[in-house]
Amino acid sequence: YFVGRNTVWVHNTECKVSDNRRRHILEGEGPDDPGHGPNRGFGNSAFPDTWSDDNAIKAVEDVANSPKSIWQQATGPGSGRNAPKTIGGPDPNAPLTTRNGRPVRFTVEGQNHSLDIRVIVEPGGEGIVTGFPINR
C-alpha cells in the first residue's frame, strides 16, 4: 500500500489470498481455464498431488511475502522484460497504477519446498491475484 501524497511503496503488510482468488487458483475459471490445485490434472503448472489445497495456498502466500522472492513489474508504464527486478518487494520507483488507472501488477518468483512458484500480486489493489508452480 502507499502512504501520503507522494507515491511511496510500503511493503510491510502480508499479501494474502482472498476466498475468491483461492477458488481461482485451485479450481480455475472453467474447462478452458482449469485450476492449479493438487489433483486437478492441470499438468506441470498444478501443485503436487501430495499437497493439500491449504498447502498450495500457503506456498503462494509464502512466496509473495518472502524477503528472498524476486519481484518484477508486469503491467503499467515501465513494465515488461526490461523492468527492474527487486528482491523482497516491489520496485520503489514503480508506478502505483497503469495508464487506465488500474493497480500495477508484479510477477513474484520464489521457492517453497524446493518448488519454483510464480505469483501475480497487485500491492495497491487486490493483493495476490494468482499463483502456480513453474519449471516442473
Describe every region a protein language model picked out.
Residues 1-14:
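HINT/intein-family self-processing domains that catalyze protein splicing or autoproteolytic maturation
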Residues 14-15, 33:
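Helix-centric, low-specificity signal for extended rod-like, repetitive segments
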Residues 15-17, 64:
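Long, low-complexity, intrinsically disordered regions
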Residues 22-23, 27-136:
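Functional cores of ribonucleases/endoribonucleases
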